[in-house]
């Protein structure tokens, strides 16, 4: 009996000492701060709680630019994350980095996880799909440009809070009334190149670059110095001189000035909705991107923004299985609908859009379907999207040149001509470096 007792004690001790089956860790680098950072952390927590085999570890790596730079360095050093969030302007660069990535379609197939590219919203999935039809990255947080406005400020200025300006001339008139009522920042904009050049072009069915805006080849060249583009930037420059448009900086710097109530109107990401809902102390509204009513074919559709998730090469098979399971979890209609409603990002799948509509969310939150309506319209060769090499550098050039207009140092034509010339130098450089692919 004593021997049996000793044997049992030894067995129990061994069981306690033996490590539990270790979870497979999946590193996810992202660029989401604030409320969106909390959302990302919640997504990982929910997935981790739903099963015990894998553990997704999200890590904030700074801005999209900083995260991409860090990931390139990490890949070269052999310690890249499994998943990297890359903004849409980095798509062509990632596509050219064949050895550094594994197409998401391939990851899902090898893991034996059901994956139907047709289940995703076409305008979103299409942007991240190769010419051969293979989806290259997971369309995680896709947004588009919309018009946000402060309904309380509209009331104070004698404007109808339920009738936002739909055209650029109407924006100028509303801005003048807001200024007259004492508002020091009637209108601003975030992501200037995206909102005022890229989306502006698609919305007016006007070419931004040749080769279908780069979607049909890396030998594309910029064309956004057309008379329509010059007219628009000239109008914004004149609004800046009159104090009707106040430039608040690059990237999403203007977002905070709208949420705080400092600026009354802004063009920016549909994903600003989550921040507004959480932090704004005023009633806000969402409307479509303004357009020029005399331009034939306008409004057309807006282009995609936000980012997708790329799977990095050089990982183990069981780790890729974890990545596939995580993507499958994010694609569940109820999960994707929850994310869309919380953030203002576009619904990931058709099913999540239908679920959101059926729940009455759009009726209860007027304007939240604007981004979807702008994106589901049939696209043209000029409006399908923009996919250019060295796009990050091109956007920086556009920021620099447009800042010269806002400061009154260059005319709109000078600035756009210079932006196109400098941007085309970047495209030529990218083409030379990647001449093996079309």
Residue map of PLM features:
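Extracytoplasmic "Venus flytrap"/periplasmic binding protein-like
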Residues: 46-120, 156-158, 163-166, 257, ...
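A structural signal for short loop-to-beta-strand junctions that line the ligand-binding cleft
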Residues: 73, 81-82, 113-154, 185, ...
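Extracytoplasmic/periplasmic substrate-recognition and gating elements
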Residues: 77, 133, 157, 230, ...
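Hinge/lid segment of periplasmic solute-binding proteins
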Residues: 87-146, 172, 198-202, 228, ...
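Short, solvent-exposed loop/beta-turn-alpha elements that line the ligand-binding surface or hinge
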Residues: 105-120, 164, 206-231, 278-279, ...
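Long, aromatic- and glycine/proline-rich binding clefts that accommodate carbohydrate-like moieties
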Residues: 119-120, 341-400, 404, 432-438
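Extracytoplasmic/periplasmic solute-binding protein
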Residues: 129-140, 145, 155, 169-221, ...
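Glycine-centered hinge/linker elements that transmit conformational signals in sensory
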Residues: 172-178, 217-248
